[in-house]
Amino acid sequence: MINGKKMGLGILSYKAPETLKKTIASLEQQKAGSFFDDSVIYFNDFCDRDKEIADAFSYRAVGGPNIGFTAQQQLAEHLDADYIVLIQNDCPLIENFSELKKQLTMAVELIETGRIDLMRLRHQWHVGEGFCDVEKYAGFYNICVVNEAFIAKEHGLDEEGLKHSWVKSFKRYIRPLKARRLIGRSVYVEKSPEKLFPKYIQKTGDVLIVDSECIDYTEQSFLIQKDFFLNTLCKFINENPKKRTLHGFQVPEIILNCLWWRKKHFKIGVCKGLFTHNRFDDSFRKNHLFYNKKI
């Protein structure tokens, strides 16, 4: 509980039992569960094996048929909390308990005072697999001063990928809207993004606050007020289905990353972060080492 507000942890899971076990183990190692008032795992395609895993770690298990990432709504609804941290089964904790308490307390205070609407919790530097924000940003912008904490290999980049080029200015000229939408990604590589883009990025303490006009919504690892998540974001998702889907399922990221999101000017917090992204079995992505075509 933070300032009288209940805290909830929700994990969305589909298949990948070994990955889930490693993620839960990372939380258990730091006794993260003691920080939360409620902890729930929501299983897509819920089965007996899933419940056995949850029971083994003393997590409450809920679930149903596979409905994809939109199951985050059901996950949130099952959490008895005012603020919820939503992660996925492949998002292990990589910081200690003290850092977890510090960052989540700070995030709640920023939301309570109206400074931010959502706090991203994917680690700013140890981003894990499948993160292409910096690569895309560097395709349109020359890096001014690389942050000393930046780890190029985390992004599959080398000096060639970060070198300066006049072509980037031309790309921004012919595609100004896309260039603007990429500005928020500067927080993962630039030393002082708030000085480069003061119109869109501010800094308070160790937190960068980015206008949603130039940073995407992400389903992976974030803290948010439960009421705001359900009655604002999920409401929009449910009312605006898209033709573009993933394996036939609606995808919150596809639905929310639209003109509505950009014009709402939500304030997205980016801090050091707590969770990375690593998968060890049952990936649905064809280019993944652990791709499983049967799921």
Q: Could you describe each region identified by the protein language model?
A:
Residues 6-8:
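Cell-envelope/extracellular polymer assembly enzymes that use nucleotide-activated donors
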Residues 22, 174-295:
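C-terminal catalytic/acceptor-binding lobe
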Residues 95-127:
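Conserved donor-nucleotide/metal-binding helix-loop-beta segment in metal-dependent transferases, i.e.
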Residues 84:
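Short aromatic/hydrophobic "clamp" motif used to bind/position activated sugar donors
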Residues 90-92:
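The conserved acidic donor/metal-binding loop of glycosyltransferases
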Residues 16-31:
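Short, well-formed alpha-helical segments that are part of the catalytic scaffolds
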Residues 64-79:
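Glycine-rich, basic loop-to-helix element that forms the pyrophosphate-binding segment
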Residues 27-63:
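Acidic donor-binding segment of Leloir-type glycosyltransferases
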